[in-house]
C-alpha cells in the first residue's frame, strides 16, 4: 500500500514517549492549572499526563529563553478543557515544553476557544509536533509579532470545523522564512502536502518538524510507520489496532485501555474517562467539602440535573414525584446578585438561612423566580434588607414554611428591613406561608403598606408575638419626614483604593431605638450630590450602600472601610442612623451626616490604549495613542522608549529568484491625517447609558460576538495583569531613572529570535501629549516602541505597564544603489565574471540581484542572482556567450524593493579566429623566460597526458562506446557562432541547460529554437567522456517520440550538445502544474482518460523504438520524459534531470545514485537491467500520470522502498483510477519479468484509443516496424551494441530473448 511520508518527528515522538515512560497504566491526572509570574511555577506540571481542566500559562515578564531550555514535560499528552498562553517572555517555541501534547479536548472553552496564544512577544513557532486533535472549540492566535509557521499548519487535520479560527496580527507571512523540512534547501525529506483553505503546501510545525498526516480512513490516528491505530485511539499509538497502545482516547479511557462506551458498572466522567460508583462518590468539586456528585444516565455529574435528586443512601439521581425535592445545605447564604441566586436553582428545601441584599439590578424578578421559585422550605430565617431593586417578593411563589431553627438576633424568623421600593409580598398570603416559631420584623419599608404586613401576621400565625415597635407604623408605608440630628465625622484616612471613616456615636432617647447605620457613597466628580437615594432614571441605584452594625462597646465610635474604590477619584459620602421609636406620641427621631467629599490617593495608570504608528520619511516615525482607561491621577507625561530590531537572518535562506517575493511595507496610516480631538462621541450631559439594549435594536451577530469576546478578554487581562508585579516599574523617574532604564532594557531588550536586537541601544523620551515623533532613525528598519503613562504621583507609585507597537521607517531612495562601477574579467574564452560591491547600508536586507546584459544588435537578457550565489564570488559568471560586443548593468533588490541600475559596462567576447591569432602573437612576442616556462609546462603536460592515458575507465555498456577521451568531429558538428543563448532552463546531469537559438541548423529554417546542454568547465575527464558518450548515443536515434539530437559544438570550450527544445519541460513538472491548487497552473483541465492513454502510448512508442535498437533505458520516469509545445510526450535525453530531482535517487552502499522507487525487483536484487525492467518502470510512470506526479511509495524511506519491492510489494491500487490503466499497471508489475508485456504488446492493447496523428508519426506504425512487430526483450548487455544510424534495425525479432 502507499504510505505517507512521516518525517522523523515520528521517531522523535517515539523516543520521547519511551524516555518519558508513557503508558496508559501510569496516567497521572492533574486538575486545572493557572501558572503565572515565575518560570519555576511550571514545575507543577511534572508527572502530569492529563490536565483535567484548563492550562493557563501567563504573565512571565522577566523570563528569558535560557529559563525554558531545561524545561520539558513529555508526560503531558492531553488537556481536557483549553490551553491559554499570554505574555510569556522568552518562550520561543512549545516543541520542547510539550513535545507529546497530542489532544486538546475542549470540554469547557475559553470564550469559545480551545487554544489561545495571545501577545507572546518572543514565540517564533507553535511547535506542537505531536498535536493530532482539537476536538471542540476554535483556535485564536493573535498579536504575536514574531510568530511564523502558521501558514504551514493544516488546522483541518486537527479540528472538525477550523473555519471559525481567528489568526490575525502575527508576523507577516512574507517576512517569515516558512520552510518545511526537505524544501528550498532545508534538511530532510519533504513533509506531506495537503490543501487547506484552497492552498496546497507542505505541512509542518517548524523547519525541522513535519505535521502528521496519516493515510488512514476517517481521520484515524497512525503509528510512526504509517500503520493505522485502533479506531478508539486519538493522537497516535505505539502499536496498530491495539486499544491499549493509544496516546489518548477518542471516547473514554478505563483501566489502561480506550473504549467507545464505558464498561458495565462504570460511568462517564468529564467526557473522557470512566469511573466506578465508588470513585464518583469520592470526587469533590471543591477540596474539603462534601461530595455533591451523582450518577445520572450513565454519567458521573457534579450535581443531579433539575427534576432529579439524590437521597442520602444512594449516589444515583432519582426522578422526583411531582415537584422535585432538592435539599441544599447553605448555612447562611447572602444573595446579592442574580449570579449568587443561581446557586439555588432547583432547590426546594433550603437547609440554612437566606439573606437577600439586592441593591442593584433591573427587572430581576424573572431571573430570581428561575432560581428561587421552587423553594418550599427554609429551615432558618429569611432576612431581606437594603434590597432597593426589589418591588415584589412574588418570586418566592412556592414558599410555604420558614421553620426558624435559627433566628435573627435570636428573635426574628422573617426580617424585612430598609427596602425602599418593596411594595408587594407576593403570593405568601394566598399560599399559606407558615412561621411556627419566632417573630416577624418590618421596618423602613416606606412603600410597603401596613395592611399587607398585618395580613401576613394572620396567615403565618405570628399575630401577638411581636410588639408595635417590630412592625412600626412610622417606618412602613410612611414617606413623611422625621426629625433628625446631625452626625459628624470625626476622622477619615484615604488610600488609593479605600477610605476609612469614623463618626460620632449617636445616642437616641431610647438606646434600643438605634438599630444600625447605613453609609451612602458614590463617585462625584462635582460637589453637587443630593441625598436622594432612590433609583435613578436608568432603574439602578445611584448611591452605594454599606450596612454598619453598632459597635459592641458603648464608648467606641462607629466606623467603616469603603472598598474597593477607584484611585484618584472624588467620592461623596454621608451616613444615616436607622432608628425607630416605641412611643406612639413621640415624633420620629433620626440622625444623618451632611455630605462630605473625599479624594482617594493616586495609583499607577493602566496602559495607554490604541497605539498606532506611521512613517512619513526614512528617518522618522510618528506614534499616536489614546490615554489609559484609568488614569488614577493627573497624567503629566508619557515615557516613550524605542529600540531598533534586527532583521530576520533566515530570509537569506530563501532563493527569491525562484520564490515569490512579497515585501514588508511602511505605509502611511491615514488615521494620522485626522484633526486632533476626541474620536469618541461625548454623552449628553446629565444622561447615562442604560444597561439594557433598546427594544428592536441588536448588533450584527458577527460584530456582537467579536465585541463580546474583545470586551471579556480585555477584562480578563485587566484582572490578571494586576496580580503579578510589573516587569519594570518606574518607581522614581528623577532619582532612579538610570536604574529603571536598565530594568527596562532587560525587559524589552531580550534578544529577538533570529537576530541580535540586544546589541542596539534603547532610546527614550518624555512627551506631554498622546503623540510622539521619533527622529534620527535608520531607514527601512523595524523598531519596537514602548509607551508608559505617568501621572503626577509617578515618583511614588510609578508609571503604567507598557503597551507596545512595531513600526518600520520608510526606505531611503538611494540606499539600495550599488556603489562604484561594475567590473568584469574574462573567466574563459566564452564567459566573463562580473563583479560589484554590495550596497553598504541597504534598506533592510539585500535579497537578490538582477543583471541585464545584451549583445550588440540583440534583445537584452535578464539574469537573477540570489544573494547566496553572489556571496560565493562577489558577482556572477556569464557563460556560453557567443562572440561579440556586450554591455551589462546590475541592480539590487532589498526588502524595500529594487535599487537603481548601475552604469553599463562594455566587454568583448573574441571569436575563434581572433583567439588563434592572439595565441600566435603571444608565441612570437614572449621573452626567453616565457619560453622556458612554456617548455616546462609542455613537459608537465606530456607526463600528465601519459598518466591520463594509462587510466582505465569502466563503462556500464563497455562494448557500446569506447571510453577514449578523444572526440572526432563529424557531420553533427555545428559552428559555435551559429548558436545564441537566451536563458537558463535548469541544471542537468553534466552542467547547465540553456534555451537558445541555432541558425541554419535545419533546411528551410533560418533559426531553430533549441536546448543547449553544457559540461562544467571544471568537469573531470570521466565526466567529459560520459557527456560525449550521451551525445553519441543520441546520434543514432531518429524517432518522433524520443528527444532528438540536433548537433554538437566540440570545438572550443565549453562543449555544447544541441537538443530538440521541449518548451513545456519535463513530464513530472507538467503534471504537477495541472493540479487545481498549483500556483503555476496554465489553466488546462486535469487530463481525461483519453489524454492519459495518449501519454502512455507516446512513451511506450519511444521505449519500443529503444528496445528495437537494443537499448535499455534504466531510468524511465516522468522526470525523464519531456513535453513539447503541442503536448507530445517524448523519452528524454537520459540524465538531464538527475540533478534537478536528486531526491528521487538513492545511493546504495556507496555506489551511484539509483532510482529505487522506479526500479524492478530483479534490478534491485541482482543489478539486472532489461527491457522487462523498463516495462516495470513504465508501470510506475502510468501511476505518476494518474496521480499527477505524486511520489511513489509516499511515506516510505528509500531503504523501506528497497525492502518493500524486493519482498514482492507493489504500489497500492488507486481510487477512481480507470480500470484499463489499473490493469495495465498490474501487468507491468508482475514479479516474473517474462510475464510482463513488451512495449509493442502494450501498444497493441491501446492502439485503438490513440489519436489518428499517432499512426502517422509513431515508430510502432512505421515501415521499419511494419505496424506492430514483436520485439525481443533487450538485456543490459545487448544494449551495448551500437544502434544503426538509420533508426530501428530489425523489427522482426521475437519475444523471449536472453535475460540476466
UniProtKB/Swiss-Prot annotation:
What's the Enzyme Commission number for this chain?
Answer: 2.7.10.1
Where Phosphotyrosine occurs, the residues are 1145-1146
Give the record's GO CC terms. axon; insulin receptor complex
* Record's subcellular location: Membrane
Task: Output the superkingdom of the source species.
Answer: Eukaryota
Q: In this protein, which residues make up the domain named Fibronectin type-III? A: 483-603, 607-707, 818-912
Q: Which residues are glycosylated?
A: 47, 311, 411, 492, 528, 616, 634, 756, 885, 898
CDD domains in alphabetical order? FN3 (cd00063), FU (cd00064), PTKc_InsR_like (cd05032)
| Compositionally biased region (Polar residues) | 1272-1300
Q: How is it modified after translation?
A: Autophosphorylated on tyrosine residues between pH 7.9 and pH 10.5.
Q: Where is the Protein kinase domain?
A: 979-1254
What broad class of enzyme is this?
transferase
Point out the signal peptide segment. 1-26
GO term, biological process aspect, one: male sex determination
Q: Which residues lie on this side of the membrane: Extracellular?
A: 747-921
Sites where the protein binds ATP: 985-993, 1013
> Which GO terms of the molecular function aspect are on file?
ATP binding; insulin receptor activity; insulin receptor substrate binding; phosphatidylinositol 3-kinase binding; transmembrane receptor protein tyrosine kinase activity
Subunit description: Probable tetramer of 2 alpha and 2 beta chains linked by disulfide bonds. The alpha chains contribute to the formation of the ligand-binding domain, while the beta chains carry the kinase domain.
Its UniProt domain note says: The extracellular domain is required for sensing alterations in external pH.
Primary role: Receptor with tyrosine-protein kinase activity. Functions as a pH sensing receptor which is activated by increased extracellular pH. Activates an intracellular signaling pathway that involves IRS1 and AKT1/PKB.
What's the protein here called? Insulin receptor-related protein
Q: Which gene name does the record give?
A: INSRR
